[in-house]
């Protein structure tokens, strides 16, 4: 009986030691939470999924990025604040969304300064841009991982606009953004603040007769159904970005994993840019098929708009940048 007990205890101890050994040898797995407001079928969300897949594969599963689309983790502002507090690890925002936390991000949103994807890339890579991103990292603990191409913002309207003077015909739906309101006020349009969700009804009922957003957003919300013209103003070029909590980047990842994550975001960001640009002809054809005429203003009329916009531009950067920044950004065009 005593022998049996000794054998039983020995076997139990051996089992415990074996299990302990297995536990100590288990591979560390780091889970990073990634919040996006956009739907799963968007190019932006697909880019996030590609990044997650590349990181998982290249780290052999030691780093898993869980992507939460469609606002499951909140709004863009929530992502920024949560990443600063370490509640989530990675987020998505428009560059405009960062201006509330670091005013110098207005650099990317100054009207009539960026006119193409290549131009946006040059701005993102510029010394001025890198300084702003470094300031965000040092003061807010947020690391920008890559920029995302959302294309130019144009004017969509029921009114025929072929000259700078024609902008006075427009009652423009605008987001409650001071810079946009100042801009269209300077262009002699009548600004009207409405929620994005109210654009369709506002156009149908005549509360407004124009609005400004990117083409992909127009089609996603079927707003081509309530307009007759697209006026290619390219008054701003929308740049979004993926960002990461610096605390998560430094404390949750090994040096090798950090390099893999940085590389994956670089690859995923470039894929998003390339894919978005490839889709633009498709988007434009969809707009034309819906019966919307695209108007390209003559160069002299665009120059008039630039001149009219100068007071609004000065207001938007007052106390942040000298007016010389406008020409500096324009001169970055490839």
Predicted regions and their residues:
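Short, low-complexity disordered leader/linker segments with a strong preference
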Residues: 1-31, 334
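N-terminal secretory/targeting leader peptides
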Residues: 23-119, 128, 137-139, 143-334
